[in-house]
Regions:
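N-terminal helix-turn-helix DNA-binding module of bacterial transcription factors
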Residues: 1-63
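N-terminal helix-turn-helix/winged-helix DNA-binding helices
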Residues: 2-6, 45-77, 81-83, 92, ...
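Short, solvent-exposed amphipathic alpha-helices that sit
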Residues: 39, 77-91, 165-168, 194-214, ...
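Periplasmic-binding protein-like
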Residues: 120-126, 180-185, 189, 231-242, ...
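Flexible loop/hinge segments that line or gate small-molecule binding clefts
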Residues: 126-165, 188-189, 241, 261-273
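Hydrophobic alpha-helical segments within soluble ligand-binding/sensing domains
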Residues: 158-183, 222-226, 243, 277-296
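An alpha-beta-alpha
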Residues: 169-213, 298-311
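Flexible loop/turn connectors
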Residues: 227-311
Protein backbone atom coordinates (compact mmCIF):
# COMPACT_ATOMS: atom_id res chain seq x y z
CA UNK A 1 0.00 0.00 0.00
CA UNK A 2 1.30 3.42 -0.94
CA UNK A 3 1.72 6.00 1.84
CA UNK A 4 -1.44 8.01 2.33
CA UNK A 5 -1.68 11.35 0.58
CA UNK A 6 -1.35 14.26 2.97
CA UNK A 7 -3.19 17.57 2.58
CA UNK A 8 -1.91 21.07 3.44
CA UNK A 9 -4.39 21.13 6.32
CA UNK A 10 -2.90 17.93 7.76
CA UNK A 11 0.61 19.27 7.20
CA UNK A 12 -0.30 22.42 9.13
CA UNK A 13 -1.54 20.34 12.08
CA UNK A 14 1.64 18.25 12.09
CA UNK A 15 3.84 21.36 12.13
CA UNK A 16 1.66 23.29 14.58
CA UNK A 17 1.18 26.25 12.22
CA UNK A 18 -1.64 27.75 10.17
CA UNK A 19 -2.54 26.57 6.69
CA UNK A 20 -1.52 30.00 5.40
CA UNK A 21 1.97 29.53 6.83
CA UNK A 22 2.20 26.15 5.12
CA UNK A 23 1.10 27.76 1.86
CA UNK A 24 3.83 30.40 2.13
CA UNK A 25 6.49 27.76 2.78
CA UNK A 26 5.43 25.46 -0.04
CA UNK A 27 5.12 28.28 -2.56
CA UNK A 28 8.31 30.10 -1.48
CA UNK A 29 6.42 33.24 -0.49
CA UNK A 30 7.73 35.92 1.90
CA UNK A 31 6.48 36.50 5.44
CA UNK A 32 7.66 33.28 7.07
CA UNK A 33 10.44 32.53 9.54
CA UNK A 34 13.26 30.58 7.79
CA UNK A 35 13.32 27.93 10.55
CA UNK A 36 9.56 27.46 10.29
CA UNK A 37 9.84 27.18 6.53
CA UNK A 38 12.57 24.56 6.85
CA UNK A 39 10.44 22.61 9.35
CA UNK A 40 7.44 22.61 7.01
CA UNK A 41 9.44 21.58 3.93
CA UNK A 42 11.10 18.80 5.91
CA UNK A 43 7.72 17.52 7.12
CA UNK A 44 6.33 17.74 3.59
CA UNK A 45 9.15 15.52 2.36
CA UNK A 46 8.82 13.10 5.28
CA UNK A 47 5.06 12.66 4.87
CA UNK A 48 5.11 12.56 1.08
CA UNK A 49 3.20 15.77 0.41
CA UNK A 50 2.66 16.53 -3.26
CA UNK A 51 0.85 19.66 -4.50
CA UNK A 52 -2.65 19.50 -5.89
CA UNK A 53 -2.17 21.84 -8.84
CA UNK A 54 -5.79 22.01 -9.87
CA UNK A 55 -6.92 22.77 -6.34
CA UNK A 56 -4.66 25.84 -6.34
CA UNK A 57 -6.12 27.07 -9.61
CA UNK A 58 -9.69 27.10 -8.34
CA UNK A 59 -8.85 28.46 -4.88
CA UNK A 60 -10.98 26.07 -2.91
CA UNK A 61 -14.02 26.09 -5.24
CA UNK A 62 -15.63 23.10 -6.92
CA UNK A 63 -13.90 21.56 -9.92
CA UNK A 64 -17.19 20.08 -11.23
CA UNK A 65 -15.24 16.92 -12.07
CA UNK A 66 -16.14 13.43 -10.90
CA UNK A 67 -13.75 10.50 -11.16
CA UNK A 68 -14.97 7.00 -11.99
CA UNK A 69 -12.71 4.01 -11.35
CA UNK A 70 -13.92 0.63 -12.64
CA UNK A 71 -12.38 -2.65 -13.82
CA UNK A 72 -12.90 -2.26 -17.59
CA UNK A 73 -15.68 -2.09 -20.17
CA UNK A 74 -15.77 -5.83 -20.87
CA UNK A 75 -18.34 -6.08 -18.08
CA UNK A 76 -21.53 -4.70 -19.61
CA UNK A 77 -22.71 -3.49 -16.22
CA UNK A 78 -19.94 -0.90 -16.21
CA UNK A 79 -20.35 0.17 -19.84
CA UNK A 80 -24.11 0.57 -19.45
CA UNK A 81 -23.81 2.34 -16.12
CA UNK A 82 -21.12 4.73 -17.38
CA UNK A 83 -23.35 5.90 -20.22
CA UNK A 84 -26.19 6.66 -17.82
CA UNK A 85 -23.88 8.06 -15.15
CA UNK A 86 -22.29 10.50 -17.58
CA UNK A 87 -25.74 11.76 -18.59
CA UNK A 88 -26.93 12.08 -14.98
CA UNK A 89 -23.77 13.91 -13.93
CA UNK A 90 -23.92 16.21 -16.96
CA UNK A 91 -27.42 17.30 -15.91
CA UNK A 92 -25.90 18.36 -12.57
CA UNK A 93 -23.09 20.24 -14.33
CA UNK A 94 -20.36 17.63 -13.75
CA UNK A 95 -17.87 16.21 -16.24
CA UNK A 96 -16.71 12.63 -15.74
CA UNK A 97 -13.16 11.31 -15.85
CA UNK A 98 -13.09 7.51 -16.26
CA UNK A 99 -10.11 5.29 -15.41
CA UNK A 100 -9.70 1.51 -15.61
CA UNK A 101 -7.94 -0.75 -13.11
CA UNK A 102 -8.10 -4.02 -15.11
CA UNK A 103 -8.53 -5.68 -11.70
CA UNK A 104 -4.97 -4.73 -10.72
CA UNK A 105 -4.70 -3.44 -7.11
CA UNK A 106 -1.60 -1.33 -7.82
CA UNK A 107 -3.18 0.15 -10.92
CA UNK A 108 -6.26 1.03 -8.87
CA UNK A 109 -4.20 3.18 -6.50
CA UNK A 110 -2.47 4.85 -9.42
CA UNK A 111 -5.87 5.75 -10.86
CA UNK A 112 -7.08 7.14 -7.54
CA UNK A 113 -3.94 9.17 -7.01
CA UNK A 114 -4.20 10.62 -10.53
CA UNK A 115 -7.77 11.67 -9.87
CA UNK A 116 -6.75 13.22 -6.57
CA UNK A 117 -4.23 15.40 -8.41
CA UNK A 118 -7.03 16.62 -10.67
CA UNK A 119 -9.09 17.65 -7.64
CA UNK A 120 -12.21 15.58 -8.15
CA UNK A 121 -15.36 16.65 -6.33
CA UNK A 122 -16.02 12.95 -5.78
CA UNK A 123 -14.81 9.50 -6.79
CA UNK A 124 -17.08 6.63 -7.85
CA UNK A 125 -15.15 3.43 -7.19
CA UNK A 126 -15.65 -0.26 -7.90
CA UNK A 127 -12.81 -1.43 -5.65
CA UNK A 128 -10.47 -4.33 -6.23
CA UNK A 129 -8.56 -3.49 -3.05
CA UNK A 130 -10.03 -4.02 0.41
CA UNK A 131 -9.19 -3.83 4.10
CA UNK A 132 -8.52 -1.13 6.74
CA UNK A 133 -5.22 0.04 5.26
CA UNK A 134 -6.79 0.75 1.88
CA UNK A 135 -9.82 2.42 3.45
CA UNK A 136 -7.61 4.63 5.63
CA UNK A 137 -5.74 5.61 2.48
CA UNK A 138 -9.00 6.65 0.82
CA UNK A 139 -10.12 8.61 3.88
CA UNK A 140 -6.81 10.48 3.86
CA UNK A 141 -7.68 11.95 0.45
CA UNK A 142 -10.50 13.96 2.03
CA UNK A 143 -12.59 13.49 -1.13
CA UNK A 144 -16.11 12.00 -1.07
CA UNK A 145 -15.96 8.38 -2.26
CA UNK A 146 -18.90 6.10 -3.03
CA UNK A 147 -18.58 2.44 -4.00
CA UNK A 148 -20.40 0.48 -6.70
CA UNK A 149 -20.22 -3.23 -7.52
CA UNK A 150 -17.98 -4.14 -4.60
CA UNK A 151 -18.34 -2.63 -1.15
CA UNK A 152 -15.94 -1.13 1.40
CA UNK A 153 -16.97 -1.16 5.07
CA UNK A 154 -16.54 2.55 5.83
CA UNK A 155 -17.81 4.05 2.56
CA UNK A 156 -21.33 4.35 1.15
CA UNK A 157 -22.48 1.78 -1.41
CA UNK A 158 -24.92 2.33 -4.28
CA UNK A 159 -26.24 -0.74 -6.08
CA UNK A 160 -28.37 -3.84 -5.64
CA UNK A 161 -28.61 -6.12 -2.63
CA UNK A 162 -26.70 -9.00 -4.22
CA UNK A 163 -27.55 -11.37 -1.36
CA UNK A 164 -31.31 -10.79 -1.55
CA UNK A 165 -31.36 -10.83 -5.35
CA UNK A 166 -29.64 -14.21 -5.62
CA UNK A 167 -31.53 -15.68 -2.68
CA UNK A 168 -34.90 -14.84 -4.24
CA UNK A 169 -33.83 -16.02 -7.68
CA UNK A 170 -32.68 -19.34 -6.23
CA UNK A 171 -35.94 -19.70 -4.32
CA UNK A 172 -37.80 -19.17 -7.60
CA UNK A 173 -35.78 -21.94 -9.28
CA UNK A 174 -36.39 -24.30 -6.35
CA UNK A 175 -40.09 -23.46 -6.53
CA UNK A 176 -40.06 -24.72 -10.12
CA UNK A 177 -39.31 -28.19 -8.77
CA UNK A 178 -35.54 -28.31 -9.28
CA UNK A 179 -33.97 -30.61 -6.69
CA UNK A 180 -30.35 -30.53 -7.87
CA UNK A 181 -28.70 -27.11 -8.09
CA UNK A 182 -25.31 -26.35 -9.61
CA UNK A 183 -23.94 -22.91 -8.75
CA UNK A 184 -21.34 -21.50 -11.14
CA UNK A 185 -19.03 -18.62 -10.19
CA UNK A 186 -15.50 -17.28 -10.78
CA UNK A 187 -12.74 -18.01 -8.28
CA UNK A 188 -13.06 -16.02 -5.05
CA UNK A 189 -9.62 -17.00 -3.74
CA UNK A 190 -7.81 -14.04 -5.28
CA UNK A 191 -7.15 -11.96 -2.17
CA UNK A 192 -8.95 -9.10 -3.93
CA UNK A 193 -12.28 -7.45 -3.22
CA UNK A 194 -14.94 -9.88 -4.50
CA UNK A 195 -17.80 -8.58 -2.37
CA UNK A 196 -20.52 -8.77 -5.03
CA UNK A 197 -19.69 -12.37 -5.93
CA UNK A 198 -19.40 -13.36 -2.27
CA UNK A 199 -22.84 -11.92 -1.54
CA UNK A 200 -24.40 -13.74 -4.48
CA UNK A 201 -22.91 -17.02 -3.27
CA UNK A 202 -24.19 -16.30 0.23
CA UNK A 203 -27.69 -15.67 -1.13
CA UNK A 204 -27.61 -18.94 -3.08
CA UNK A 205 -26.47 -20.90 -0.01
CA UNK A 206 -29.16 -19.30 2.16
CA UNK A 207 -31.93 -20.42 -0.20
CA UNK A 208 -30.45 -23.92 -0.52
CA UNK A 209 -30.08 -24.33 3.25
CA UNK A 210 -33.72 -23.38 3.81
CA UNK A 211 -34.95 -25.81 1.17
CA UNK A 212 -32.74 -28.84 1.72
CA UNK A 213 -32.13 -29.49 -2.00
CA UNK A 214 -28.77 -30.89 -3.09
CA UNK A 215 -26.23 -28.42 -4.45
CA UNK A 216 -22.65 -27.96 -5.59
CA UNK A 217 -20.49 -24.91 -6.33
CA UNK A 218 -18.30 -25.22 -9.43
CA UNK A 219 -16.25 -23.37 -12.02
CA UNK A 220 -18.04 -23.31 -15.37
CA UNK A 221 -15.55 -25.72 -16.98
CA UNK A 222 -16.32 -28.34 -14.32
CA UNK A 223 -19.99 -28.37 -15.26
CA UNK A 224 -19.17 -30.00 -18.60
CA UNK A 225 -17.88 -33.11 -16.81
CA UNK A 226 -20.95 -33.66 -14.62
CA UNK A 227 -22.99 -36.80 -15.08
CA UNK A 228 -26.60 -36.59 -16.21
CA UNK A 229 -29.02 -37.88 -13.54
CA UNK A 230 -32.78 -38.31 -13.24
CA UNK A 231 -32.98 -35.35 -10.86
CA UNK A 232 -34.47 -32.12 -12.17
CA UNK A 233 -31.31 -30.03 -12.42
CA UNK A 234 -30.76 -26.28 -12.61
CA UNK A 235 -27.54 -24.39 -13.28
CA UNK A 236 -27.51 -21.05 -11.47
CA UNK A 237 -24.74 -18.72 -12.64
CA UNK A 238 -23.42 -15.68 -10.79
CA UNK A 239 -23.09 -13.79 -14.12
CA UNK A 240 -24.75 -13.97 -17.52
CA UNK A 241 -21.39 -14.55 -19.18
CA UNK A 242 -20.99 -17.83 -17.30
CA UNK A 243 -24.56 -18.78 -18.19
CA UNK A 244 -24.02 -18.08 -21.89
CA UNK A 245 -21.02 -20.43 -21.90
CA UNK A 246 -23.23 -23.20 -20.54
CA UNK A 247 -26.48 -22.47 -22.36
CA UNK A 248 -26.05 -25.10 -25.08
CA UNK A 249 -24.93 -27.77 -22.58
CA UNK A 250 -27.93 -27.07 -20.37
CA UNK A 251 -30.26 -27.34 -23.36
CA UNK A 252 -28.69 -30.63 -24.51
CA UNK A 253 -29.09 -32.16 -21.06
CA UNK A 254 -32.53 -30.78 -20.33
CA UNK A 255 -31.32 -28.64 -17.44
CA UNK A 256 -32.78 -25.33 -16.36
CA UNK A 257 -30.35 -22.41 -16.38
CA UNK A 258 -30.31 -18.93 -14.83
CA UNK A 259 -27.92 -16.01 -15.29
CA UNK A 260 -27.42 -12.74 -13.43
CA UNK A 261 -27.03 -9.13 -14.74
CA UNK A 262 -29.47 -9.31 -17.69
CA UNK A 263 -26.94 -8.09 -20.26
CA UNK A 264 -28.32 -6.67 -23.51
CA UNK A 265 -26.80 -9.47 -25.62
CA UNK A 266 -29.49 -11.86 -24.37
CA UNK A 267 -32.36 -9.95 -25.96
CA UNK A 268 -30.30 -8.80 -28.94
CA UNK A 269 -29.67 -12.43 -29.94
CA UNK A 270 -33.04 -13.70 -28.75
CA UNK A 271 -31.44 -16.14 -26.30
CA UNK A 272 -33.67 -18.19 -23.98
CA UNK A 273 -31.97 -17.27 -20.70
CA UNK A 274 -33.64 -16.22 -17.46
CA UNK A 275 -31.68 -13.57 -15.57
CA UNK A 276 -31.73 -11.07 -12.72
CA UNK A 277 -31.94 -7.43 -13.79
CA UNK A 278 -31.37 -4.24 -11.82
CA UNK A 279 -32.01 -0.58 -12.41
CA UNK A 280 -28.79 1.12 -13.58
CA UNK A 281 -30.73 4.36 -14.15
CA UNK A 282 -31.49 4.45 -10.42
CA UNK A 283 -27.82 3.79 -9.61
CA UNK A 284 -26.72 6.67 -11.85
CA UNK A 285 -29.28 9.08 -10.38
CA UNK A 286 -28.32 8.13 -6.81
CA UNK A 287 -24.66 8.79 -7.61
CA UNK A 288 -25.51 12.21 -9.06
CA UNK A 289 -27.43 13.08 -5.88
CA UNK A 290 -24.45 11.94 -3.82
CA UNK A 291 -22.18 14.34 -5.70
CA UNK A 292 -24.47 17.26 -4.97
CA UNK A 293 -24.72 16.42 -1.27
CA UNK A 294 -21.10 15.37 -0.78
CA UNK A 295 -22.15 12.60 1.59
CA UNK A 296 -24.53 9.66 1.40
CA UNK A 297 -25.64 6.48 3.08
CA UNK A 298 -26.11 3.19 1.28
CA UNK A 299 -28.64 3.22 -1.56
CA UNK A 300 -30.07 -0.14 -2.64
CA UNK A 301 -31.88 -0.16 -5.99
CA UNK A 302 -34.56 -2.56 -7.16
CA UNK A 303 -33.89 -5.86 -8.87
CA UNK A 304 -36.27 -8.14 -10.74
CA UNK A 305 -36.39 -11.63 -12.20
CA UNK A 306 -36.59 -11.74 -16.01
CA UNK A 307 -38.16 -14.94 -17.33
CA UNK A 308 -37.35 -16.24 -20.81
CA UNK A 309 -38.47 -19.80 -20.12
CA UNK A 310 -35.04 -21.29 -19.38
CA UNK A 311 -36.16 -22.40 -15.88
Amino acid sequence: MKPKIISTNQLAKICGVSQGTVDRALNNRPGINPKTKEKILSAAKTYGYRPNIHARSISGGKSMLVGVVVFDLQNEYFSGLLTKLEAACRKKGYATVVMFTHKNPEREQECIESLYRMYMDGIILCPINKGPEFENYLHSLEIPVVTIGNRLETFPYIGIDNFAAMERATEYVIGKGCSRLIYVQPSLNTGHNTYAQEERLRGFCSAVNKSGVSSSVLHWREVQTLAVTNEKTAVICSTDLHALRLLSIAKERGWSILGFDNISMIDALGLPLDSVAYDTDAVAEAIARFLNAGTAGDVLVNHRYISRNSV
